């Protein structure tokens, strides 16, 4: 009988800790729904004690997602654990994930606690969490740099208190595959009650080995849960990539001998959604989800693939959700045809109002752009869904601009502030700079522009531009995304989207730095 590997996604918690990747509640909900559609086993929806916003997001997701276990992180104290339990109350199935650092460096320098104090706090935290659920996970933070004897002592105690998952964290990406795999193996062999818990791996990519370490923890160590994120999103160099773990285990089932319950056809759509929301573009040569992942430039490779796909392809692009980017609709296409194509693409909208708004956007685009591709439709729906859920303190209305050779461009932007239209006019070093100056002249946000990037959604000069804007103010970093065939209009939409998030986003506590 084949074992099952549990996929624990922490995009909404650890992934969001990547600078600039912060998400609104509405964005977290959209990603959580996609993760559920993908059949992810456990979704770590956030860190309930970090902010009221995170608590609310976890609470809402817990009520909406029915087929995945919802999890909240909590430090090893009663206050955090109580907050997590309260946030998770609406869930069909939930888990409390509590942690404390166990390495000598962290205990001395960060916690300023003795090993005995850490031992006792870990034990009591799990005992308290068990009052709310029998599904409790414990992580020894910086486990890969912890003393083996002490680690065994702590883990034996928390399992005795009722921890059902033990997660070995390679917090700073220090591990290498053979050593990390043997660490998990040794723990399972030395801890007398290790059979009472599932062992899990959580690796960071600082040395580029997060996926390799995780797979070693599974193959060598016998771990049966992998903690990972979509696109490998995460602090510093990122986390273990969900798509790489899943496809490695599925493609090399002959070696790993494990099943995963993931619907792999949802991998690419979810990857694109996370990229669009966070503004973190997926590198073209990224395994599984990169644009070049299934591209063959070499003539020899192309010839081989045409004769027999398995000569150079070990996976099928369609199995992970890649679809041919074909022309599907035009300006004469009706609402039913639009709705049917959305269903074929696996795209869903929450209401008829959102569908109607997206269809109107499609008709407007079809009048301006001769050829409408699947990617155009996905971009329209994604932005419309975001707009429907975004708290629109500011709303883009229109844009006009004037530019002559030898003179600074001038932009005129009309937008609404709490329903009241205002007009900003300004010059700048280029049309985008002038547009941003016009908006800032009326808003006066005092924010700093950290990132401006443009991505063509399809090919050709009529392609829609997808613009990402990243703003920072008082330590908060937010992203805004806008799409339009007019790059400057897309830029204005993205800037206003970022301002809306800056206006509504609350501060959060980073669990590793508090």
UniProtKB/Swiss-Prot annotation:
Its EC number is 2.3.3.13. One of its GO terms (cellular component) is cytosol. The keyword Translocase does not apply. Keywords: Amino-acid biosynthesis, Branched-chain amino acid biosynthesis, Cytoplasm, Leucine biosynthesis, Manganese, Metal-binding, Transferase. One of its GO terms (biological process) is L-leucine biosynthetic process. Residues 5-268 form the Pyruvate carboxyltransferase domain. Catalyzes the condensation of the acetyl group of acetyl-CoA with 3-methyl-2-oxobutanoate (2-ketoisovalerate) to form 3-carboxy-3-hydroxy-4-methylpentanoate (2-isopropylmalate). Belongs to the alpha-IPM synthase/homocitrate synthase family. LeuA type 1 subfamily. This is 2-isopropylmalate synthase. It comes from Burkholderia cenocepacia (strain ATCC BAA-245 / DSM 16553 / LMG 16656 / NCTC 13227 / J2315 / CF5610) (Burkholderia cepacia (strain J2315)).
């Amino acid at each position: 009988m084949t074992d099952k590997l549990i996929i624990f996604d922490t995009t909404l918690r650890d992934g969001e800790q990547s600078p600039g990747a912060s998400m609104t509640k509405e964005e977290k909900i959209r990603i959580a729904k996609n993760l559920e559609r993908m059949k992810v086993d456990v979704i770590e929806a956030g860190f309930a004690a970090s902010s009221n916003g995170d608590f609310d997001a976890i609470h809402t997701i817990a009520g909406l997602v029915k087929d995945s276990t919802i999890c909240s992180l909590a430090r090893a104290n009663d206050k955090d654990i109580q907050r997590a339990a309260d946030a998770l109350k609406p869930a069909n199935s939930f888990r409390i994930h509590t942690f404390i650092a166990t390495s000598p460096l962290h205990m001395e320098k960060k916690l300023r606690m003795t090993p005995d104090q850490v031992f006792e706090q870990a034990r009591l935290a799990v005992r308290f969490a068990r009052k709310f659920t029998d599904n409790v996970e414990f992580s020894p933070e910086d486990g890969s740099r912890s003393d083996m004897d002490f680690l065994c002592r702590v883990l034996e105690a928390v399992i005795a208190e009722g921890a059902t998952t033990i997660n070995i964290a390679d917090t700073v990406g220090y591990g290498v595959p053979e050593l990390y795999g043997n660490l998990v193996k040794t723990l399972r062999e030395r801890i007398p009650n290790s059979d009472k818990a599932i062992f899990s791996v959580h690796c960071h990519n600082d040395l580029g080995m997060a996926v390799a370490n995780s797979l070693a923890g599974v193959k060598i160590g016998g771990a049966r849960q992998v903690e990972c994120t979509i696109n490998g999103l995460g602090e510093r160099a990122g986390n273990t990539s969900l798509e790489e773990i899943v496809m490695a285990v599925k493609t090399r089932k002959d070696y790993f001998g494990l099943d995963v319950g993931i619907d792999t056809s949802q991998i690419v759509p979810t990857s694109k959604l996370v990229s669009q929301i966070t503004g973190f573009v997926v590198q073209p040569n990224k395994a599984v989800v990169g644009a070049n992942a299934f591209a063959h430039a070499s003539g020899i490779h192309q010839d081989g693939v045409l004769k027999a796909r398995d000569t150079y392809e070990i996976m099928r692009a369609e199995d992970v959700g890649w679809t041919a980017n074909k022309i599907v609709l035009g300006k004469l296409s009706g609402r039913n045809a639009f709705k049917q194509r959305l269903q074929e693409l696996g795209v869903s909208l929450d209401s008829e109002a959102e569908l109607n708004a997206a269809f109107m956007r499609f008709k407007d685009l079809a009048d301006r752009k001769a050829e409408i591709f699947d990617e155009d439709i996905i971009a329209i729906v994604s932005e419309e869904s975001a707009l429907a859920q975004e708290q629109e303190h500011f709303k883009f209305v229109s844009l006009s601009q004037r530019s002559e050779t030898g003179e600074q461009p001038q932009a005129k932007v009309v937008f609404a502030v709490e329903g009241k239209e205002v007009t900003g006019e300004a010059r700048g070093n280029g049309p985008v700079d002038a547009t941003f100056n016009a908006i800032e002249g009326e808003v006066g946000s005092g924010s700093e522009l950290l990132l401006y990037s443009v991505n063509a959604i399809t090919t050709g000069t009529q392609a829609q531009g997808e613009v990402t804007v990243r703003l920072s103010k008082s330590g908060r970093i937010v992203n805004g995304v806008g799409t339009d065939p007019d790059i400057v209009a897309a830029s204005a939409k993205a800037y206003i989207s970022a301002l809306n998030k800056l206006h509504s986003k609350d501060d959060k506590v980073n669990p590793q730095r508090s």
